[in-house]
């Protein structure tokens, strides 16, 4: 994990010395919006109108943030509209790379770049900041539209509806207040919470972060005992955002990030929810455990210097979940 500073790549880990051992995630830098008519979104500039084959998605199959965008692309049937490049799961001294020697990695199918940071420099030669996925790229203007996953999934939710996207609103007006409230604390204590625990460099920072992870999992277990999904019996973006963390929890976060008080498979409702969404048409196709496990265990040398990949634990995500019968 490194960063660009005024257009120059530096291989640097996160600085936690000045934060008492706490991991702090940087805000995404590119915040434009792709819209149905090209009008500006809540942030950034306008001009990014929804068009077939104009946009390209750069992802890692290992990354939970990028995974959100792949799921929304699948749910909305946007494969004919938005092409994809998949980086190599290993993120070492040069950050994300386009080495396609690992099965499932595609290389940079647009520009044949060697490293993802070269794409960022194509958009901004003087860019300073982390080089992350996902990246939503505009092939017409050769620039980054957005690298903020939370906003990309909202673009995908509606921008292509008039062009033939699949029906379905995963951020419906009647539920937006509830979804935003859920997203807030789930992001802080679960999605990013596992990273706060795993990347902590002091006992105090770890203790604080891991406690919040399991407090929130207990809260989610109660919510999912009341209805099939987080806001009721309708799948929303809040479920997708939570799910990409849950599917990585037992295979990676339990051991690698020391979130080992409980496994997701120890929770009746969370584990059922995990299997429920996994078994939806097309979702399993977006999951690649080889990329997930190789990335975390072999890329984070500060946490796991030997690069040894732990053995488990194993989950059978195809096991019947019964939540459709239970909640109707």
From Swiss-Prot:
Residues 203-311 are annotated as: Dimerization. The active site is at 63 (nucleophile), 195 (proton donor/acceptor). One of its GO terms (molecular function) is glutathione transferase activity. Glutathione binds at residues 96, 130-133, 148-149. Signal peptide: none annotated. The keyword Oxidoreductase applies. Belongs to the GST superfamily. Xi-class GSH transferase family. It catalyses: 2-(glutathione-S-yl)-hydroquinone + glutathione = hydroquinone + glutathione disulfide. CDD domains: GST_C_Omega_like. Residues 172-296 form the GST C-terminal domain. Catalyzes glutathione (GSH)-dependent reduction of glutathionyl-hydroquinones (GS-HQs) to the corresponding hydroquinones. Can use a variety of GS-HQs as substrates, such as GS-p-hydroquinone (GS-HQ), GS-hydroxy-p-hydroquinone (GS-HHQ), GS-methyl-p-hydroquinone (GS-MHQ), GS-menadiol, and GS-trichloro-p-hydroquinone (GS-TriCH). Also displays GSH-dependent disulfide-bond reduction activity toward HED (2-hydroxyethyl disulfide), and is able to catalyze DMA (dimethylarsinate) reduction. Exhibits no GSH transferase activity with 1-chloro-2,4-dinitrobenzene (CDNB). Its EC number is 1.8.5.7. It is an enzyme of class 1 (oxidoreductase). The reaction mechanism of reduction of GS-HQs is believed to involve a redox-active Cys that attacks the sulfhydryl of GS-hydroquinone, forming protein-glutathione mixed disulfide bond and releasing the hydroquinone. A GSH comes in to regenerate the protein and release GS-SG to complete the reaction. Homodimer. Pfam families: GST_C_2 (PF13410), GST_N_2 (PF13409). InterPro entries: Glutathione-S-Trfase_C-like, Glutathione-S-Trfase_C_sf, Glutathione_S-Trfase, Glutathione_S-Trfase_N, GST_Omega-like_C, GST_Omega/GSH, Thioredoxin-like_sf. One of its GO terms (cellular component) is cytoplasm. The keyword Oxidoreductase applies. Keywords: Oxidoreductase. Changing residue 63 to A: Loss of GS-hydroquinone reductase activity. The record marks 253, 296 as: Lowers pKa of active site Cys. This is Glutathionyl-hydroquinone reductase YqjG. Changing residue 195 to F: 46-fold reduction in GS-hydroquinone reductase activity.
């Amino acid at each position: 994990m490194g960063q660009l500073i005024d257009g120059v790549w530096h291989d640097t880990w996160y600085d936690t010395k000045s934060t008492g051992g706490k991991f702090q995630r940087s805000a995404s830098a590119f915040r434009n919006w792709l819209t149905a008519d090209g009008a500006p979104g809540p942030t950034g500039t306008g001009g990014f109108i929804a068009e077939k084959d104009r946009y390209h998605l750069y992802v890692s199959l290992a990354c939970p943030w990028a995974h959100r965008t792949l799921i929304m692309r699948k749910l909305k049937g946007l494969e004919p509209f938005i092409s994809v490049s998949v980086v190599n799961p290993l993120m070492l001294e040069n950050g994300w790379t386009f080495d396609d020697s690992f099965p499932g990695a595609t290389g940079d199918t647009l520009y044949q770049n060697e490293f993802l940071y070269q794409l960022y420099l194509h958009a901004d030669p003087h860019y300073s900041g982390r080089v992350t996925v996902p990246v939503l790229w505009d092939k017409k203007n050769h620039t980054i539209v957005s690298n903020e996953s939370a906003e990309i999934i909202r673009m995908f939710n509606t921008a292509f509806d008039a062009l033939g996207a699949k029906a379905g609103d995963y951020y419906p007006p009647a539920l937006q207040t509830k979804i935003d409230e859920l997203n807030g604390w789930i992001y802080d204590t679960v999605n990013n919470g596992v990273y706060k625990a795993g990347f902590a460099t002091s006992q105090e920072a770890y203790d604080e972060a891991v406690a919040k992870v399991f407090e929130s999992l207990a809260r989610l277990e109660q919510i999912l005992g009341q209805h099939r999904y987080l806001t009721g019996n309708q799948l929303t973006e809040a479920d997708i955002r939570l799910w990409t963390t849950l599917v990585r929890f037992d295979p990676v976060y339990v051991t690698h990030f020391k979130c080992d008080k409980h496994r997701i498979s120890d929770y009746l409702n969370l584990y059922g929810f995990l299997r429920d969404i996994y078994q939806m048409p097309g979702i399993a196709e977006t999951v690649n455990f080889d990329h997930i496990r190789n990335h975390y265990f072999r890329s984070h040398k500060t946490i796991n210097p030997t690069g040894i990949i732990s053995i488990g634990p194993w989950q059978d995500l195809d096991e019947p979940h019964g939540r459709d019968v239970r909640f109707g």
